[in-house]
């Protein structure tokens, strides 16, 4: 039994009091876990574009005040009543997509989108309807069921997975979102085949991870499409073979027509990792007539819609979406950790900056400027 079990813990957290404002480092109170909940001492968390998306005010589910963060790893501090899969001291990764193995979605075998706690998670509270986080007497909302921008957090016991204690938490925390998302989009969603041609729009962490997945599948050519050419040399480490800067070919008509001419008909697989509805269309229309598949990974702003001419689909192109790379979170993340430990999966190479919690706003600035792939906040 830990000295803090059953007690309220006061700790540091980065609080988003309102949209479009910098995070504020505050002392918050983290209540003990209730039934089927786990309290975790977070040791490291990544800073992801999804956190910035919600902070920007563009997220239709964005709630404030909130503790953001969803790419975290740590050590179990205590567990609530009925928790059997975890105990104090376990090394864990928080999961924004849970896995209950009981709901219609989990039982279908067709998706990783467990819906057991979807409604309460979207409402920023724990499954029983309240928050475990507060500051200055005010309730704070949870974020994506994880809230890892805090030294301690509470999650549902289906939103957590136990991992090998040999894995460095300050590295494998990234398997809680970005790397897994891109890597799995290539392997699980698109099911890229050996010798195929692929293109990735957006060479951030997710896009680079798509490249890794395409390389793992044996793709023959992997194109990176980005308006920041500074990313191209680094992307070669992740399997990319060719690069196109849309700004350089703007005088040649649409980017999709340029790419179709360049590749003798288009790509077998394309991936949109930006969240821009215009590039989503470009990615689809740059796939090969008859069999091309385009995977949407990036999240667009509230109210935005995608469009294309129906004939693009009639002639055999396929538009697909991918969340968390199609991985079944509780079952598959520990396997990805093992792949990392066996040096079969790059993780360290995504980390460009390590910062303390006090500098978390700097991590957002680096991301917005395109000067980082992933910044890690270490507690």
UniProtKB/Swiss-Prot annotation:
Its cofactor is Zn(2+). The modification N-acetylserine is found at residue 2. It catalyses: a primary alcohol + NAD(+) = an aldehyde + NADH + H(+); a secondary alcohol + NAD(+) = a ketone + NADH + H(+); S-(hydroxymethyl)glutathione + NADP(+) = S-formylglutathione + NADPH + H(+); S-(hydroxymethyl)glutathione + NAD(+) = S-formylglutathione + NADH + H(+). Keywords: Acetylation, Metal-binding, NAD, Oxidoreductase, Zinc. One of its GO terms (cellular component) is cytosol. Gene3D superfamilies: Medium-chain alcohol dehydrogenases, catalytic domain, NAD(P)-binding Rossmann-like Domain. It holds the Pfam family ADH_zinc_N. Zn(2+) 2 binds at residues 100, 103, 106, 114. Its EC number is 1.1.1.1, 1.1.1.-, 1.1.1.73, 1.1.1.284. One of its GO terms (molecular function) is alcohol dehydrogenase (NAD+) activity. It comes from the Eukaryota. Binds 2 Zn(2+) ions per subunit. InterPro entries: ADH-like_C (IPR013149), ADH-like_N (IPR013154), ADH_3 (IPR014183), ADH_Zn_CS (IPR002328), GroES-like_sf (IPR011032), NAD(P)-bd_dom_sf (IPR036291). It is an enzyme of class 1 (oxidoreductase). GO terms for biological process: alcohol metabolic process; formaldehyde catabolic process; regulation of nitric oxide metabolic process; visual learning. The keyword Signal does not apply. Belongs to the zinc-containing alcohol dehydrogenase family. Class-III subfamily. Class-III ADH is remarkably ineffective in oxidizing ethanol, but it readily catalyzes the oxidation of long-chain primary alcohols and the oxidation of S-(hydroxymethyl) glutathione. This is Alcohol dehydrogenase class-3.
């Amino acid at each position: 039994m830990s000295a803090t079990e059953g007690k309220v813990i006061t700790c540091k957290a980065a609080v988003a009091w309102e949209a479009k404002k910098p995070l504020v480092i505050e002392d918050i109170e983290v209540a003990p876990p209730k039934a089927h909940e786990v309290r975790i001492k977070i040791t490291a968390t990544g800073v992801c574009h999804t956190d910035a998306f919600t902070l920007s005010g563009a997220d239709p589910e964005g709630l404030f005040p909130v503790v953001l963060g969803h790419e975290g790893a740590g050590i179990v501090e205590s567990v609530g009543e009925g928790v059997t899969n975890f105990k104090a001291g376990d090394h864990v990764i928080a999961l924004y997509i849970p896995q209950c193995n009981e709901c219609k979605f989990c039982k279908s075998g067709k998706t990783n989108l467990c819906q057991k706690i979807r409604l309460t998670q979207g409402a920023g509270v724990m499954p029983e309807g309240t928050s475990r986080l507060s500051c200055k007497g005010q309730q704070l909302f949870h974020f994506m069921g994880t809230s890892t921008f805090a030294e301690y957090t509470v999650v549902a016991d289906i939103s957590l997975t136990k991992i090998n204690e040999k894995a460095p938490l300050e590295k494998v925390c990234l398997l809680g979102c970005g790397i897994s998302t891109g890597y799995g989009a290539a392997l699980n969603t698109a099911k890229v085949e050996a010798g195929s041609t692929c293109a990735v729009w957006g060479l951030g962490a997710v896009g680079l991870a798509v490249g890794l997945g395409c390389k793992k599948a044996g793709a023959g050519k992997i194109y990176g499409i980005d308006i920041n050419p500074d990313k191209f040399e680094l992307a070669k480490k992740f399997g990319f073979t060719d690069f196109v800067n849309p700004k350089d070919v703007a005088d040649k008509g649409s980017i999709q027509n340029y790419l179709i001419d360049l590749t003798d008909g288009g790509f077998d697989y394309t991936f949109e990792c930006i969240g821009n509805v215009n590039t989503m269309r470009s990615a689809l229309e740059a796939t090969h007539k008859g069999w091309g598949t385009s995977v949407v990974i990036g999240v667009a702003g509230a109210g935005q819609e995608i469009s294309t001419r129906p004939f693009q689909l009639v002639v055999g192109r396929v538009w697909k979406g991918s969340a968390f790379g199609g991985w079944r979170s509780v079952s598959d993340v520990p396997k990805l950790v093992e792949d990392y430990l066996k040096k079969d999966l790059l993780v360290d190479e995504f980390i460009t900056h390590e910062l303390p919690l006090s500098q978390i706003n700097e991590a957002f600035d680096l991301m917005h400027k395109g000067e980082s792939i992933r910044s890690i906040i270490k507690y």
